[in-house]
Amino acid sequence: MTEISDLDRQIEQLRRCELIKESEVKALCAKAREILVEESNVQRVDSPVTVCGDIHGQFYDLKELFRVGGDVPETNYLFMGDFVDRGFYSVETFLLLLALKVRYPDRITLIRGNHESRQITQVYGFYDECLRKYGSVTVWRYCTEIFDYLSLSAIIDGKIFCVHGGLSPSIQTLDQIRTIDRKQEVPHDGPMCDLLWSDPEDTTGWGVSPRGAGYLFGSDVVAQFNAANNIDMICRAHQLVMEGYKWHFNETVLTVWSAPNYCYRCGNVAAILELDEHLQKEFIIFEAAPQETRGIPSKKPVADYFL
């Protein structure tokens, strides 16, 4: 029982945006690893479920997401990666989601995004944040080891395929995804890389991605993939959409974006997708958490003699 009460205390602490001890992070990651190692590369998820896109360390907006979508375990969640980088609270964001995963493994599914990578986090903020908040890179190491265990995709009721980025020219079937050895750093190319980096594009066939990794894929590619795997649609994140969600290719691909006012300056709204037990869809749109609920000190107004 003490293990669960410890975990509940850590969850409460993290919900208040307070750090847990380095030793607690180590133990949490060890428990998470035991759970995640059992999950498939195409993790099965049952409806009803609420599907979420990128969070990017925007902790107070994640709290807003839980406010509008319901808390774990009452709501069953699927997060499609990119928990860290760019926002101010990547540590608290990822550790809260991980603690919820350990506490309620059947009520929250976490899949890997392109930012769940050692290389990317050293550039876009998570590494520096761990160093600043803990005084060493040990916590970053624990977390990035867990990244390697995160599933690459999920399938809801056998009908909705969820992945962070998109499709790969090396992959025609879900079974091919199931055979990938995922327990590694995100490679620079190949099928695992493509799943996390690719984007839909109004084109046919495959195109070169301006991101420098993954591919652009067209409507014909999607039609083929969906038919071959007997699925209705692909749900993904990875691209900022100002309205929070966006349909592509006659509603066969959906982008969901869950970081409102991205980077604290883009002015976009965010969305989550609620699927009921019949896979009926309802989008919940939400805005950034109000400034006064946040931990960032609001900038002092510039004195008028500078204007």
Swiss-Prot record:
Mn(2+) 1 binds at D54, H56, D82. It catalyses: O-phospho-L-seryl-[protein] + H2O = L-seryl-[protein] + phosphate; O-phospho-L-threonyl-[protein] + H2O = L-threonyl-[protein] + phosphate. Its cofactor is Mn(2+). Mn(2+) 2 binds at D82, N114, H164, H238. Its EC number is 3.1.3.16. It comes from the Eukaryota. SMART domains: PP2Ac. The active site is at H115. The modification Leucine methyl ester is found at L307. Its main location: cytoplasm. InterPro entries: Calcineurin-like_PHP_ApaH, Metallo-depent_PP-like, PPA2-like, Ser/Thr-sp_prot-phosphatase. Binds 2 manganese ions per subunit. GO terms for cellular component: centrosome; cytoplasm; nucleus. One of its GO terms (molecular function) is metal ion binding. It is an enzyme of class 3 (hydrolase). It is found in: Cytoplasm; Nucleus; Cytoplasm, Cytoskeleton, Microtubule organizing center, Centrosome. Serine/threonine-protein phosphatase 4 (PP4) occurs in different assemblies of the catalytic and one or more regulatory subunits. Belongs to the PPP phosphatase family. PP-4 (PP-X) subfamily. This is Serine/threonine-protein phosphatase 4 catalytic subunit.
